[in-house]
Amino acid sequence: MQIVVATHNEGKLVEIRRILEEDLGADAENIELVSAGSLHLPDPVETGVTFQENALLKARAVAIRTGLPAVADDSGLIVDVMGNAPGILSARWAGAHGHDKANNALLLAQIEDIPDDKRTARFRCAAALVVPDTETGADVTGGVAADGITVHTTAADGSPAPVHARYAIKSETVELGDMPGRIIREARGVHGFGYDPLFVPDDQPAGRVSTEPDHEGEPLTSAEMTPAEKNAISHRGKALKALVPAIEALLH
């Protein structure tokens, strides 16, 4: 069975495959994960106001066009003292989508005067599985999902354009995962992406501490952890693992 991961980032596809394979066990051999990018599908416009809504929008956009089950995630950083910002705006907090250094610099400036014990935060991920109804037929719903939310992509002129739906939606599942921790004052580590170099998770791998100059013995940031260490505690890992029963149900 093919399942489409709603991403154009092949690195994320590899990460999601690794996480799911750990829990699917032998069932993993019966699933082929492919990216939306490899199928040349456009990115939908993320018009949701929560991580759950955006994850569902991305998965719906793939499922209603391809007739294949689709997995999508939406995640971001929630900083308590900032009223849960950056939230769904995490990737474009400084204005440019995916500009990690600018986003990190702005975040540090905004909480510069906040004492260490008040810099609590958490990464949150919503992971969605959308299963299309391939028995209903083609050209249904005109891009409108079961709850009335229209899925859009971006037209050539930059305006929103409804995604043409070839299939209705049979079922939807969405799960949440959190990774609590705190924001430090300077970046550490070379792994990961986004805010990982600034984030120290509460859960730490046994027997491992930072070896960075001036920070020896301190807890690791997400960017100092190996991919396996991070996946074991990460928000994305928790949300995707919670989807496994719904994915397994497609196979049996």
From Swiss-Prot:
It is an enzyme of class 3 (hydrolase). One of its GO terms (biological process) is purine nucleoside triphosphate catabolic process. The active site is at residue 74. Its EC number is 3.6.1.66. GO terms for cellular component: cytosol. Substrate binds at residues 7-12, 75, 193-196, 230, 235-236. Mg(2+) binds at residue 74. Its cofactor is Mg(2+). InterPro entries: dITP/XTP_pyrophosphatase, ITPase-like_fam, RdgB/HAM1. It catalyses: XTP + H2O = XMP + diphosphate + H(+); dITP + H2O = dIMP + diphosphate + H(+); ITP + H2O = IMP + diphosphate + H(+). CDD domains: HAM1. Binds 1 Mg(2+) ion per subunit. It comes from the Bacteria. Residues 202-229 are annotated as: Disordered. GO terms for molecular function: dITP diphosphatase activity; ITP diphosphatase activity; metal ion binding; nucleotide binding; ribonucleoside triphosphate phosphatase activity; XTP diphosphatase activity. Pfam families: Ham1p_like (PF01725). Keywords: Hydrolase, Magnesium, Metal-binding, Nucleotide metabolism, Nucleotide-binding. Homodimer. Belongs to the HAM1 NTPase family. PANTHER family: INOSINE TRIPHOSPHATE PYROPHOSPHATASE, INOSINE TRIPHOSPHATE PYROPHOSPHATASE/HAM1 PROTEIN. Pyrophosphatase that catalyzes the hydrolysis of nucleoside triphosphates to their monophosphate derivatives, with a high preference for the non-canonical purine nucleotides XTP (xanthosine triphosphate), dITP (deoxyinosine triphosphate) and ITP. Seems to function as a house-cleaning enzyme that removes non-canonical purine nucleotides from the nucleotide pool, thus preventing their incorporation into DNA/RNA and avoiding chromosomal lesions. This is dITP/XTP pyrophosphatase.
